[in-house]
Amino acid sequence: MQLEKMITEGSNTASAEIDRVSTLEMCRIINDEDKTVPLAVERVLPDIAAAIDVIHAQVSGGGRLIYLGAGTSGRLGILDASECPPTYGVKPGLVVGLIAGGEYAIQHAVEGTEDSREGGINDLKNINLTAQDVVVGIAASGRTPYVIAGLEYARQLGCRTVGISCNPGSAVSTTAEFAITPIVGAEVVTGSSRMKAGTAQKLVLNMLSTGLMIKSGKVFGNLMVDVVATNEKLHVRQVNIVKNATGCNAEQAEAALIACERNCKTAIVMVLKNLDAAEAKKRLDQHGGFIRQVLDKE
């Protein structure tokens, strides 16, 4: 796909004179354009849901969720991956973010790395990619060689693959088994795909990882019941989670959490089923860690 023909490289008439307006009007123009992004994502919800189901099936079978991108797209993947262990208590490495140029590229522009097909393949080889894994290639343009080559390699291994881009019919979309293509239109600053395209990608990644965690039993109601208490704020959140899930008071919630080494799921089952920590944990294990199943089937 030629660069000049890409929607993400087009000129936005709404911002054609943004350099001549007041600061407040600049903000209004940007905000008005940003309002269109959730609607673009809404149009591809069926594609996102299909990807979530595939990701969940593979992860349930022992696979991993791998994000692969360059520049802003790579950073968004790393951001999403890095939040999964503290929020949902999963092991580091279950959700992996890879960026062209490696760790240095998280904070710095590393010229030319996104054009390296070998880089995309080698980064996947270095994490010992297997057919159980799901590779999600992220590229606003849909033409990034690093991502395309990684998706091709993943498919050769038998991996399920997802391509996220903002240009219809892009190489990323056609290379991946599942395509998610929110069309956000031309950017406020021509070609600055960190803006609307980046926002759309972030919304999609939020859904992919959150959907996976909900389907994996990491959410009860709308509570993050596997949150790891790594600071005082999260200690308080754990207490509130147990309170909200059970109707008990703060003292009862804290006592249950202490008794089970601060595992929210176990504490919730302890309170709701009037069990000690060992028995509550046993029942959770019997039902794959799903609180709902413990409550509904016993």
From Swiss-Prot:
Coiled coil: none annotated. Residues 55-218 form the SIS domain. Its EC number is 4.2.1.126. One of its GO terms (molecular function) is carbohydrate derivative binding. Keywords: Carbohydrate metabolism, Lyase. It catalyses: N-acetyl-D-muramate 6-phosphate + H2O = N-acetyl-D-glucosamine 6-phosphate + (R)-lactate. The active site is at E83 (proton donor), E114. It holds the Pfam family GKRP_SIS_N. Induction: Induced by MurNAc 6-phosphate that releases the repressor MurR from the DNA. Repressed by MurR in the absence of MurNAc 6-phosphate. InterPro entries: Etherase_MurQ, Glucokinase_regulatory_CS, MURQ/GCKR, SIS_dom, SIS_dom_sf. GO terms for biological process: 1,6-anhydro-N-acetyl-beta-muramic acid catabolic process; amino sugar catabolic process; N-acetylmuramic acid catabolic process; peptidoglycan turnover. Specifically catalyzes the cleavage of the D-lactyl ether substituent of MurNAc 6-phosphate, producing GlcNAc 6-phosphate and D-lactate. Together with AnmK, is also required for the utilization of anhydro-N-acetylmuramic acid (anhMurNAc) either imported from the medium or derived from its own cell wall murein, and thus plays a role in cell wall recycling. Homodimer. This is N-acetylmuramic acid 6-phosphate etherase. It comes from Shigella sonnei (strain Ss046).
